[in-house]
């Protein structure tokens, strides 16, 4: 916790660590592959010397459609939140009662604030309400001369969001 990156440094190193800068996207989720899957695999194999292991995947019951089979025979995935029927509401209630504040003004935020898998509505909310986060995503696209999402840049989304009035999207 004390040494955790707070400003996207590992992600930025991933983007600009190639011969040509490369932005992760829906077709090539190199962020998941490199920062999660291959990193944990290297740790298990090289650091711990473990040849087969189980992997707890944090997918909730209300997002069970996201489950997938691993192609790696060394890994047995399991989904404890699905098995326990834990939903987003349960998770939010847990964090409200916790002494640790995640500082998520919007439940859809998570730690990858501008993930290309988030809805356009959520990303537009970030443009209006989280300027530091927005600016980081804008800067990555500018430096890489590419976009995370085919057909719409963070700059275009931000320009659109800034032109809009204040609307409440709460139910």
Label for each model-derived stretch:
Residues 1-171:
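Nucleotide-activated chemistry modules centered on ATP-dependent adenylation/adenylyltransferase
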């Amino acid at each position: 916790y004390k040494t955790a990156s707070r400003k996207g440094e590992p992600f930025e190193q991933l983007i600009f660590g190639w011969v040509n800068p490369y932005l992760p996207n829906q077709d090539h989720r190199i962020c998941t592959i490199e920062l999660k899957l291959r990193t944990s695999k290297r740790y298990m194999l090289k650091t711990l010397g473990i040849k087969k292991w189980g992997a707890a995947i944090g997918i909730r019951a209300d997002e069970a459609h996201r489950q997938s089979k691993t192609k790696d025979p060394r890994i047995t995935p399991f989904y404890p939140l699905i098995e326990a029927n834990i939903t987003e509401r349960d998770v939010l209630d847990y964090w409200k009662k916790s002494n640790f504040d995640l500082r998520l003004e919007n439940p859809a935020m998570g730690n990858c604030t501008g993930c290309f898998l988030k809805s356009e509505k959520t990303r537009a909310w970030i443009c209006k309400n989280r300027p530091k986060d927005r600016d980081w995503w804008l800067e990555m696209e500018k430096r890489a001369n590419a976009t995370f999402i085919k057909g719409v840049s963070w700059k275009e989304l931000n320009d659109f969001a800034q032109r809009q009035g204040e609307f409440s999207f709460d139910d």
